[in-house]
Amino acid sequence: MTIEQILEAIENMKVLELNELVKAAEEKFGVSASAPVVVGGPVAGAAVEEEQTEFDVVLENAGASKINVIKVVRELTGLGLKEAKEAVDGAPKTLKEGVSKEEAEQIKAKLEEAGAAVTVK
């Protein structure tokens, strides 16, 4: 197995599977995956900020060209005409959940091009 294949296998694992993998590696090799304590580190109570990896795309409103927005929503979500119209009429509405930053930005660009107001959370 190449390093690339191993990384790909790890990338496709769920959180629970990764946790089990870490525990198994700790037991097998007699090591600990916990971070070492640093003297003089960040002030207690300071939040460690993790980089967000999954994003939600929220349609805030359809703007003036509602028909174009409905067409784009159908294209992006695979919804039928009625469901896409209901999603647009029901704004603010989350259209996509748990997508990568790149995909979220592409979706946002397409919707904004059609005239919609969109946020990525």
From Swiss-Prot:
GO BP annotations of the record are: translation
Q: What SUPFAM superfamilies would the database entry show?
A: ClpS-like, Ribosomal protein L7/12, oligomerisation (N-terminal) domain
Please name the GO terms that the record assigns under molecular function: mRNA binding; structural constituent of ribosome
At the top level, the lineage of the source is: Bacteria
| GO terms under cellular component | cytosolic large ribosomal subunit
Q: Write the record's keywords in alphabetical order, separated by commas.
A: Ribonucleoprotein, Ribosomal protein
**NCBIfam families membership:** L12
Family classification:
Belongs to the bacterial ribosomal protein bL12 family.
What job does this protein perform? Forms part of the ribosomal stalk which helps the ribosome interact with GTP-bound translation factors. Is thus essential for accurate translation.
Q: How does it assemble?
A: Homodimer. Part of the ribosomal stalk of the 50S ribosomal subunit. Forms a multimeric L10(L12)X complex, where L10 forms an elongated spine to which 2 to 4 L12 dimers bind in a sequential fashion. Binds GTP-bound translation factors.
Name this protein carries in UniProt = Large ribosomal subunit protein bL12
Question: Which source organism?
Answer: Alkaliphilus oremlandii (strain OhILAs) (Clostridium oremlandii (strain OhILAs))
Gene name in the database record = rplL
